[in-house]
Amino acid sequence: MDKEDLKRQAAARALEEVRSGMKLGLGTGSTARHFVELLGEKVRGGLDVIGVPTSEVTRADAERCGIRLTTLDEIDRLDLTVDGADEVDTRLELIKGGGGALLREKIVAAASDRMIVIADESKWVDCLGKFPLPVEVIPFGLAATRRAIEKAFTQVGAAGQLKLRDGEAGHAFVTDGGHWIVDAHLGRIPDAPRLAKLLSEIPGVVEHGLFIGIASTVVLAGTEGIRTVERA
C-alpha cells in the first residue's frame, strides 16, 4: 500500500466526522486534497456543507468538486477544519506549511471549534524539526529578519540553515498573501512552543509553520490500519 492510499484512508476517516449543516475549513496539500475529493463525492450525494478554503489551490479543487464555498468575512465560526501536516509530535504540535499556505491554514484553524489533522504514519515524530520549518516573511528588510530568526533559534538551543524558498523561473516563491518563505533546516526543535512565541514577536515574520495547541485530533493511517490520537 503506497502513501497516497494511506492518505486517502486518513481522509476517509476524518470525513466520518462531517455532518450536514457543518461549516468546514478545507486544508491545503496532498492529503487535504484527498479529503476535498471525498467530500465532493458526499456533496454530490446530498451532503449539505459549506467550506472555507485555505489556499487558491484548494479553492479551485473544491469548486471543481462542487463544494459550496464562503469566507471568514461571511461567517463567524467554523465547526471543523480538516488539514494535513508535515510533522506531528506526541503532544499534537505540528509543522505545517510545506505547500506554502501556512498563514491561511492557521487563520482558518484558529477560527474552528475543532481541527482534525490527517496524515500517513511517516509524519508522526517524537520531536519536531526534521522537516524544514517554513517561516513566512515580508520581503522588505529580509536580511534583518533572517538575523532575528537565527537569534530565536539560538535561544531555544536549535541550530541550522535558513534557505529562501524558490519559486518559478528562479524567483522567490510568493505566497497567496504576497509574502516570501524562508525554510529553516534545523533537524530538531527542542522547545517548539517557545520558538513559536519568539518567531511571532519578530516584526518581519508574518507567520510560521509551528501549530501549537491547535490540533484537536490526529488521524494516522499506517500499514496496520488507522490510529486516532486525541489531545489530552
UniProtKB/Swiss-Prot annotation:
It catalyses: aldehydo-D-ribose 5-phosphate = D-ribulose 5-phosphate. One of its GO terms (molecular function) is ribose-5-phosphate isomerase activity. Catalyzes the reversible conversion of ribose-5-phosphate to ribulose 5-phosphate. SUPFAM superfamilies: D-ribose-5-phosphate isomerase (RpiA), lid domain, NagB/RpiA/CoA transferase-like. The active site is at 105 (proton acceptor). It comes from the Bacteria. It is an enzyme of class 5 (isomerase). The keyword Isomerase applies. Belongs to the ribose 5-phosphate isomerase family. HAMAP family: Rib_5P_isom_A. Substrate binds at residues 28-31, 83-86, 96-99, 123. The keyword Isomerase applies. Its EC number is 5.3.1.6. GO terms for biological process: pentose-phosphate shunt, non-oxidative branch. This is Ribose-5-phosphate isomerase A. The lineage of its organism: Bacteria, Pseudomonadati, Pseudomonadota, Alphaproteobacteria, Hyphomicrobiales. Homodimer. Keywords: Isomerase. Pathway: Carbohydrate degradation; pentose phosphate pathway; D-ribose 5-phosphate from D-ribulose 5-phosphate (non-oxidative stage): step 1/1. The gene is rpiA. Transmembrane segments: none annotated. CDD domains: RPI_A.
